[in-house]
Amino acid sequence: MARTVQCIKLGKEAEGLDFPPYPGELGKRIFENVSKEAWAGWLKHQTMLVNENRLNLADARARQYLARQMEQHFFGGGADAAAGYVPPSA
């Protein structure tokens, strides 16, 4: 049976992650409080942040920025919007 968590992002009980997705204390908090669905949403947002801000993930400052954004996305007031992103018109 799948592990469930009370997802802090979605505000409902949902299937939990299979393993901590990030090292350290932040990864543990995400594992205990974030669902697979909410994590998938973060991965999409993270991709937009990397692309729109032209982040070089070999740069430690870019990785630190993404870690701060991840924490804000799940446990703070929300991550930065992707600057310059315009959603496709339907």
Curated annotation (Swiss-Prot):
Gene Ontology cellular-component annotations: cytosol
GO biological process, one term: cellular response to oxidative stress
Keywords per UniProt: Iron
UniProt GO MF annotations: iron ion binding
Transmembrane segments: none
Superkingdom of origin organism: Bacteria
Function: Could be a mediator in iron transactions between iron acquisition and iron-requiring processes, such as synthesis and/or repair of Fe-S clusters in biosynthetic enzymes.
Recorded family membership: Belongs to the Fe(2+)-trafficking protein family.
Record-linked NCBIfam families: PRK05408.1 (NF003817)
PANTHER family, alphabetized: FE(2+)-TRAFFICKING PROTEIN-RELATED
Protein name in the entry: Probable Fe(2+)-trafficking protein
